[in-house]
Amino acid sequence: MKTALTIAGSDSSGGAGIQADIKTMTANGVFATCAVTALTAQNTTGVTDILESTPHFLAEQLDAVFTDIVPDAVKIGMVSSAELIAVIAEKLRQYGAERVVVDPVMVATSGAKLLRDDAIQALTSQLLPLATVLTPNIPEAEILSDLPITDAAGMEAAARTISQRYGCAVLCKGGHQINDADDLLWRDGGGKWFRGRRIPNPNTHGTGCTLSSAIAANLAKGYDLDQSVERAKAYISGALAAMLDLGKGSGPMNHMFDLKGGFAE
């Protein structure tokens, strides 16, 4: 059985973070392992507290996974400090990690920055050059490219700039504010659009975590990047269309809507 590692924060509501990652990877037919960067006290209405992992303990978790259940792919999500980012980059290099998907969690839904300037510097200088593919939303792509994005042409310019800067593929997610659910994959000097329709579901907590984890799971199974993105988009559309309705705020998706179906293949 193929394996995938998620390096991210824990979400006590179960809709995002490692909880969403593990459910997504399982539903997509791979065995999931994890290294926790932070514990969060949160629910569908917001975050009330965060307890960050120490660099030493994060390193211990990564050593434990890489020396035993070696991952076929790695997904990296919420990492809130420069020190933790440095640990992750060091361990990825030490163990020769392959098929690395980075979801650069930098901006909250409200638009507020989630990373200090030193953490952004560590992310861009140490972690992004190790990535196979980045999955920024529009605000994150604007930060990484230093370009404004107001339309599809802006997405293309930003994705091209990010790819050239960090030497990796970039999946720029347009659903945040530009269009229905059309995402642009920029790789090897060219772009490819993956069309999608917006699902009329207000419960979208954890969509970024879920998409990046589904991509990692499919890369782990041997699908190429284009196929992995296409399959991941189909999976997340199905999870949203299942219309799970939990909590008082922006609730989670139904990650297990098709547990015995084709996504595990």
Residue map of PLM features:
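N-terminal basic/disordered segments at the start of proteins
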Residues: 14-30
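Short, small-residue alpha-helix embedded
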Residues: 142-143, 201-225
